[in-house]
From Swiss-Prot:
Any one Gene Ontology cellular component term annotated for this protein: nuclear speck
Domain of life: Eukaryota
GO molecular function terms noted in the UniProt entry: RNA binding; zinc ion binding
Zn finger limits (CCHC-type): 160-177
Keywords, comma-separated and alphabetical: Activator, Metal-binding, mRNA processing, mRNA splicing, Nucleus, Repeat, RNA-binding, Zinc, Zinc-finger
Broad class of where this protein is predominantly found: nucleus
UniProt subcellular location: Nucleus, Nucleolus
Protein name: RNA-binding protein 4B
High-level lineage: Eukaryota, Metazoa, Chordata, Craniata, Vertebrata
Biological process (GO), any one: positive regulation of gene expression
Physiological role: Required for the translational activation of PER1 mRNA in response to circadian clock. Binds directly to the 3'-UTR of the PER1 mRNA.
Residue ranges of every copy of the RRM domain listed in the record: 2-72, 78-148
Annotated source species: Rattus norvegicus
Subunit structure: Interacts with TNPO3, which may mediate nuclear import of the protein.
Length: 357
């Protein structure tokens, strides 16, 4: 079946008139008129060629009509995939085999399979029925409709014409232009002719970029990389210092004169013990200063050479707070000898208390 296009039809033309005009050259299967053009389906290809030759520019109702083969593409696929082809088979031999079922537009052999483009869909169906699972040059070939989306339309399949760029001398798979229209990279071919291309510098573990951030590449994974212990400690100290400045900047500064000398020093011993000063006795103050200046590690820690200890009573010992201040105020009126003896007892109690450590 051949579909013919009829253009420039006059308004007076009818379907019956067009059908009777084309039936002079062959059997008409279908005739349709759409406004000022129409389509006629003729069963025989030879009859269609005769109708085109005789009716093109035929004057109908005073108007010259145009008759030519329809150029619309058939919705049915005409591309066939032929598998299991003999390695000695050529394009001409395979084309001649399929031309037994209809005109072949293109025939390409790729290794042990090939693609054949038939002119008509009905010829492609007949070729599948007649050639599938048949012997050809010692091999049973398989013929089926192609499911490939690449080059669904025939043309530009030989080495003489690339279907991507349109130039001659190379296959489409060797075309320097990719599917997006950009020129492909020929790094391997360049290396073979002019030497290897220098590869970009690759950083090692723990190294930084050899360019500044303003001119170098951005490291999007910098926050996830493992940093050294020194870098983490320095960052933590800096953040803690900044946090202290921000949160305590509104507090008034403490004068150094209001802080005791033994607390204002930067080398304060956290384990050092000091007695509360007694304002009623100068000897007690001197003894307390001497005891404070003495080192803890310079004491005689042998229990055999110690003097006899006098355990304090329940009410004696160290005290802090308001009660201890009241006891110190009342002790100001006591005898200095009693205060000295009490100090010696408290000093021994302090020594016995911390000697276990």
């Amino acid at each position: 079946m051949v579909k013919l296009f009829i253009g420039n039809l006059p308004r007076e033309a009818t379907e019956q008139e067009i059908r009777s005009l084309f039936e002079q050259y062959g059997k008409v299967l279908e005739c349709d008129i759409i406004k000022n053009y129409g389509f006629v389906h003729i069963e025989d290809k030879t009859a269609a060629e005769d109708a085109i030759r005789n009716l093109h520019h035929y004057k109908l109702h005073g108007v010259n009509i145009n008759v030519e083969a329809s150029k619309n593409k058939s919705k049915a696929s005409t591309k066939l995939h032929v598998g299991n082809i003999s390695p000695t088979c050529t394009n001409q031999e395979l084309r001649a085999k399929f031309e037994e079922y209809g005109p072949v537009i293109e025939c390409d052999i790729v290794k042990d399979y090939a693609f054949v483009h038939m002119e008509r869909a009905e010829d492609a169906v007949e070729a599948i029925r007649g050639l599938d699972n048949t012997e050809f040059q010692g091999k049973r070939m398989h013929v089926q409709l192609s499911t490939s989306r690449l080059r669904t339309a025939p043309g530009m399949g030989d080495q003489s014409g690339c279907y991507r760029c349109g130039k001659e001398g190379h296959w489409s798979k060797e075309c320097p232009v990719d599917r997006t229209g950009r020129v492909a990279d020929f790094t391997e071919q360049y290396n073979e002719q002019y030497g290897a291309v220098r590869t970009p510098y690759t950083m090692g573990y723990g190294e930084s970029m050899y360019y500044n951030d303003a001119y170098g590449a951005l490291d999007y994974y910098k926050r996830y990389r493992v940093r050294s212990y020194e870098a983490v400690a320095a960052a933590a100290a800096a953040s803690a210092y900044n946090y202290a400045e921000q949160t305590m900047s509104h507090l008034p500064q403490v004068q150094s004169s209001a802080v005791p000398s033994h607390l204002n020093s930067t080398s304060v011993d956290p384990y050092d013990r000091h007695l509360l000063q007694n304002s009623g006795s100068a000897a007690t103050s001197a003894a307390m200063a001497a005891a404070a200046s003495s080192s803890y590690y310079g004491r005689d820690r042998s229990p055999l050479r110690r003097n006899a200890a006098v355990l304090p009573t329940v009410g004696e010992g160290y005290g802090y707070g308001p009660e201890s201040e009241m006891s110190q105020a009342s002790a100001a009126t006591r005898n200095s000898l009693y205060d000295m003896a009490r100090y010696e007892r408290e000093q021994y109690v302090d020594r016995a208390r911390y000697s276990a450590f």
